[in-house]
Amino acid sequence: MAKRQLNRRQNWRIEKIQGERAARAAKREQHVLQELEGGDLGPEQLGLVIAHFGVQVEVEAQDGEAAGQVFRCHLRANLPALVTGDRVVWRAGNQGIGVIVAQMPRSTELCRPNNHGQLKPVAANVDLIVIVFAPAPEPHPNLIDRYLVAAEHAGIRPLLLLNKADLINEENAPTLNAMLEVYRNLGYPLLEVSAHQGDGMQRLQQMLDGHISVFVGQSGVGKSSLVNSLLPDAGTRVGDLSEWSGQGTHTTTTARLYHFPNGGDLIDSPGIREFGLGHVSRDDVEDGFIEFRELIGNCRFRDCKHDREPGCALLKALEDGQVSQQRMSSYRSIIASLPEDSY
């Protein structure tokens, strides 16, 4: 069934109602904050944001007698937007409720544009981004490459994870193996696992230990199943593939941070079908394709668009087999999706 198109007046009315609701929620939140800060608050202490629920977050105490305990906290209005993985300074109040008073500097942040083109942080202080895909739904190199560019741009090390390896068969193996070979040749770490059968899961756990990781990938690739296998007590709800579309149904509703027994953390984020890169420039995209780095700057023309220009180093590398057609197609698709002012 086709999605109903809204006219300008309907969109305006929806935004007006949402704005009024947000204003009422903010007013209620401010009243709660005033009551909390007017009472007895404990000393400032360090905390870790492990989940975000709109105007409130769950914070795990990092020091003191309450270390390891989780508190629901309100945010002061002057704070920037917080995300799972943020390190904060907070003060405990009554009845297990606290107030966040400061945000600690982030070592990294993973961002994506929202529907209005504004940057929205997804997770903070991550040092490993696990890009999950599977034989079904059919993996798209373009989406994988978008994640890789985002990881390179954010300075976060990527790990390519093929889940549902038990679904590889004679029909899909040739295409899948050809796609994987491209990434192996580029030197990207790649692991094949099956959360359902347990194959490769021990190796995955070893690769995650000691890192703050985030799982990304389109819906239906088994991110929640992976979390349930790695952390049986997490209780992440699992969704099936939609029979009609073959795409996954979104199950995780908020990003949450989990601890591994041997050290390291995992942030399980909602399924993302299309990872936008509107916040990066053409230069950022070119730098995100690691095999392009030694070639960029060697073209005959400084403003080369790597399309049909004579003396293009990228086109020559493509012709010689140094750059794969798969990656070149992804690059062109990503560049075409950028706003014109990013050129």
UniProtKB/Swiss-Prot annotation:
<feature type="binding site">
    <location>
        <begin position="217"/>
        <end position="225"/>
    </location>
    <ligand>
        <name>GTP</name>
    </ligand>
</feature>
<dbReference type="InterPro" id="IPR030378">
    <property type="entry name" value="G_CP_dom"/>
</dbReference>
<keyword id="KW-0694">RNA-binding</keyword>
<feature type="binding site">
    <location>
        <position position="299"/>
    </location>
    <ligand>
        <name>Zn(2+)</name>
    </ligand>
</feature>
<dbReference type="GO" id="GO:0005525">
    <property type="term" value="F:GTP binding"/>
</dbReference>
<dbReference type="InterPro" id="IPR004881">
    <property type="entry name" value="Ribosome_biogen_GTPase_RsgA"/>
</dbReference>
<comment type="similarity">
    <text>Belongs to the TRAFAC class YlqF/YawG GTPase family. RsgA subfamily.</text>
</comment>
<feature type="binding site">
    <location>
        <begin position="163"/>
        <end position="166"/>
    </location>
    <ligand>
        <name>GTP</name>
    </ligand>
</feature>
<feature type="binding site">
    <location>
        <position position="312"/>
    </location>
    <ligand>
        <name>Zn(2+)</name>
    </ligand>
</feature>
<dbReference type="InterPro" id="IPR010914">
    <property type="entry name" value="RsgA_GTPase_dom"/>
</dbReference>
<dbReference type="GO" id="GO:0005737">
    <property type="term" value="C:cytoplasm"/>
</dbReference>
<dbReference type="GO" id="GO:0003924">
    <property type="term" value="F:GTPase activity"/>
</dbReference>
<keyword id="KW-0547">Nucleotide-binding</keyword>
<comment type="function">
    <text>One of several proteins that assist in the late maturation steps of the functional core of the 30S ribosomal subunit. Helps release RbfA from mature subunits. May play a role in the assembly of ribosomal proteins into the subunit. Circularly permuted GTPase that catalyzes slow GTP hydrolysis, GTPase activity is stimulated by the 30S ribosomal subunit.</text>
</comment>
<dbReference type="InterPro" id="IPR027417">
    <property type="entry name" value="P-loop_NTPase"/>
</dbReference>
<dbReference type="GO" id="GO:0042274">
    <property type="term" value="P:ribosomal small subunit biogenesis"/>
</dbReference>
<dbReference type="InterPro" id="IPR012340">
    <property type="entry name" value="NA-bd_OB-fold"/>
</dbReference>
<dbReference type="GO" id="GO:0019843">
    <property type="term" value="F:rRNA binding"/>
</dbReference>
<keyword id="KW-0690">Ribosome biogenesis</keyword>
<keyword id="KW-0479">Metal-binding</keyword>
<dbReference type="Pfam" id="PF03193">
    <property type="entry name" value="RsgA_GTPase"/>
</dbReference>
<comment type="subunit">
    <text>Monomer. Associates with 30S ribosomal subunit, binds 16S rRNA.</text>
</comment>
<keyword id="KW-0342">GTP-binding</keyword>
<keyword id="KW-0378">Hydrolase</keyword>
<feature type="binding site">
    <location>
        <position position="306"/>
    </location>
    <ligand>
        <name>Zn(2+)</name>
    </ligand>
</feature>
<feature type="domain" description="CP-type G">
    <location>
        <begin position="116"/>
        <end position="275"/>
    </location>
</feature>
<feature type="binding site">
    <location>
        <position position="304"/>
    </location>
    <ligand>
        <name>Zn(2+)</name>
    </ligand>
</feature>
<protein>
    <recommendedName>
        <fullName>Small ribosomal subunit biogenesis GTPase RsgA</fullName>
        <ecNumber>3.6.1.-</ecNumber>
    </recommendedName>
</protein>
<keyword id="KW-0862">Zinc</keyword>
<keyword id="KW-0963">Cytoplasm</keyword>
<keyword id="KW-0699">rRNA-binding</keyword>
<dbReference type="GO" id="GO:0046872">
    <property type="term" value="F:metal ion binding"/>
</dbReference>
